[in-house]
Swiss-Prot record:
The keyword Chloroplast does not apply. It is found in: Mitochondrion inner membrane. Binds 2 heme b groups non-covalently. It comes from Mustela lutreola (European mink). InterPro entries: Cyt_b/b6_C, Cyt_b/b6_C_sf, Cyt_b/b6_N, Cytb/b6-like_sf, Cytochrome_b, Cytochrome_b_C_euk/bac, Cytochrome_b_N_euk/bac, Di-haem_cyt_TM. Component of the ubiquinol-cytochrome c reductase complex (complex III or cytochrome b-c1 complex) that is part of the mitochondrial respiratory chain. The b-c1 complex mediates electron transfer from ubiquinol to cytochrome c. Contributes to the generation of a proton gradient across the mitochondrial membrane that is then used for ATP synthesis. It is a multi-pass membrane protein. This is Cytochrome b. A ubiquinone binds at H201. The lineage of its organism: Eukaryota, Metazoa, Chordata, Craniata, Vertebrata. Its main location: mitochondrion. GO terms for molecular function: metal ion binding; ubiquinol-cytochrome-c reductase activity.
Amino acid sequence: MTNIRKTHPLTKIINNSLIDLPAPSNISAWWNFGSLLGICLIIQILTGLFLAMHYTSDTATAFSSVTHICRDVNYGWIIRYMHANGASMFFICLFLHVGRGLYYGSYMFTETWNIGIILLFAVMATAFMGYVLPWGQMSFWGATVITNLLSAIPYIGTNLVEWIWGGFSVDKATLTRFFAFHFILPFIISALAAVHLLFLHETGSNNPSGIPSDSDKIPFHPYYTIKDILGALLLILMLTLLVLFSPDLLGDPDNYIPANPLNTPPHIKPEWYFLFAYAILRSIPNKLGGVLALILSILILAIIPLLHTSKQRSMMFRPLSQCLFWLLVADLLTLTWIGGQPVEHPFIIIGQLASILYFMILLVLMPIISIIENNMLKW
């Protein structure tokens, strides 16, 4: 008798993507982040659902409803902090996942890569709207500053901003619609993640060497299921440590002050995972130019496959490209630091140099170094 796992229409899908999936025999821990992102998404949807049961999306009660969750709801504090810090873990996994893709040339699977970029934008949009919901000072002013960027669009900008706000400023209408979008987007993200996986399974996984591994495949279960469980345990351990020991480590103290449209905080800044893009935005003196640079800082990933000039897929055997890659990582860390600093000397010039270097590495230096490495192989 044939196993029901392999024949039933529902279990067959699970079997072919999680159990009998042929996987390369040499994929490292850098390939764990897909499953970790799935776990992050599940944690966020579940904690978010329980928070939504007690949250009210009204300017008069939003802040106090979050306080009520933390003080009066059974284990509300742990649900709230798991959701807030779960977002940070989500972005850590996202950045490492994208970094892995850049390093090992996984971007050559263009469909998977492009869906991944759409997913990144969707998660960033969700996180931004979620940050507005507690209706603290940084929530309100962050929403005001970021939505206001759309007014830089010629001709339709002002109308567009007022349409998004639902009025002439960030107010009740804005909060209500942000809550609605924040609730629906994770389900759209789940659907996109399924499409991401669908495209990946058309080609099979890449591996650290970048060499096709069709001749050497092993079943996903038990080898990679046990490996993913180890990764998941480490993720949950890190999240638990963060939530139980320093839940406010990555947050902004200003968000414990209720939103006040008459009082601007001294330094408006987003959550840490947006600081690199925020630094790029601020480094350009022109408003429209800054907005374009902000969008391009992520959208640039879409043209990475077109800029691949190397004869090798992975950076595993390309020491010069490796040096550039780690320079890019250092540059992004610098941008993250600058994004959290006030707009004054020397931070302005550091931010501008780091922004130029970011685009230089991806658009100019990487392709040139790859060509040099190709020629070095001839010597």
